[in-house]
């Protein structure tokens, strides 16, 4: 398993993974609602590529061989905006490794003291607490 920064060329693949996980884990279980429209708008590949090219957004991927199995995105302000792991690869510590990589980058490269996240849906709050978020 390799955790590394994604290139702009890989952002569409990261969005595809995020959309697939969202469909399975969230949209099917929580039909309707504004959060779906927000997610659909947020995962606009062109916008994400532009933000990444401008240095406003950073993305990491967890790769097993040639397959992207997890993705994490963080803004230049240190806010985690995306954390998705393929359902066949959960419970392997991939999310924690992605978060750790983002936190180290925030501290070392962006010189930030803390990283933030909004746990959506709410049932993910326990996961983020265990990962050190308050």
Where in the sequence are the language-model features?
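Conserved beta-strand in the GNAT
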Residues: 61, 67-84
């Amino acid at each position: 398993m390799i955790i590394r920064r994604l290139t702009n060329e890989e952002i569409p693949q990261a969005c595809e993974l995020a959309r697939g996980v969202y469909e399975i884990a969230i949209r099917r279980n929580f039909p309707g609602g504004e959060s779906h429209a927000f997610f659909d708008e947020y995962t606009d590949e062109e916008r994400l590529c532009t933000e990444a090219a401008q240095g406003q957004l950073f993305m990491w991927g967890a790769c097993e061989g040639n397959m992207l199995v997890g993705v994490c995105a963080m803004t230049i302000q240190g806010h985690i905006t995306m954390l998705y792991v393929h359902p066949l690869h959960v419970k392997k510590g991939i999310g924690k490794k992605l978060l750790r990589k983002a936190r180290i980058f925030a501290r070392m490269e962006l010189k930030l003291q803390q990283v933030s996240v909004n746990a959506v849906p709410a049932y993910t709050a326990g996961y983020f607490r265990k990962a050190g978020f308050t």
